[in-house]
Amino acid sequence: MKTNILILLLGMVTSMSWAQNDITICHTPATEKFALFASNKSFNNEHQMPRAYVHVSEAGGEMITFACADGMKANAYVIMAEKKTNNWIFVFQEWWGLNDNIKKWSEDLFTEVGNVNVMALDMYDGKLATDRENAGKYMQAFKQDRGNAIVKGAMNYVGKNAKVGTVGWCFGGGQSLQAALTVGKQTVGCVMYYGMPEEDVNRLKTLNSDVLNIWATKDQWINKEVMDKFEVNMKAAGKKLTVYAYDADHGFANPSNAIFDEEAYKDSRAKTIAYFKSKF
């Protein structure tokens, strides 16, 4: 039964419709496919409960709100460079939400990359999970249309001259790639940590940057099959993909997580910092 579920979730889910004697194949969107995992107990249990952590900004980070085209407001944690710059990194949360661990990661990026502003987007609109049950509910309730509206609202906030890199983990790994697609010509880089890739080659063809893809070989969900398919699709789209695989498990890069792998974290973090430094 477990094997059948995995095949259903990770395989290509298609439906067919006939119009003028042509067959149209519809793929399950990446965000929806990843959200389906939350209905599986094994996936939820793989996410170790994060340790309590309170981040106090040393770089002047603060929460802001901005308008979105869908008529709603959005929230973000923003750290601005002392000297004005159009370089921005958009940060995307794990399935827990925009918690203090993500704010700490944002500040690390800000400090180590240099010459950038950093914006961690609240993709759950104020909801924050401290247990697996709510994390799963929030992830399943998330709609990509709303996510796209948040990213577009952020783009209006940073302006038409901004150069934007994206990074995220878990749920946010997939959102990092979706945001890179949404940002369009202003995208300069994209980093994914164990996130669900986009499968639509035609969409991938619109990417304005390469992608740095980081994943864990012990991850049962964002696994080798998923990663191999992503490589094939990026090649078909004519886009550069750099891949680093670590002998670790899903969530290894979260220092507040019991599954944290310090060696893999330090190496992947160094590669992420170097990647963004090469973009700005």
Where are these regions (language model features)?
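Acidic catalytic loop of the alpha/beta-hydrolase fold
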Residues: 218-222
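Alpha/beta-hydrolase fold nucleophile elbow
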Residues: 158-169
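C-terminal catalytic histidine-bearing segment of alpha/beta-hydrolase fold enzymes
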Residues: 28, 235-280
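Short beta-strand/loop motif that positions the catalytic acidic residue
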Residues: 207, 213-215
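Serine-hydrolase catalytic machinery in alpha/beta-hydrolase-like enzymes
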Residues: 22-57, 62-157
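Short alpha-helix in the alpha/beta-hydrolase fold that links the catalytic acid
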Residues: 105, 223-233
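A conserved short beta-strand
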Residues: 185-196
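Gly/Ala-rich beta-loop-alpha elbow adjacent to hydrolase catalytic centers
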Residues: 168-172, 176
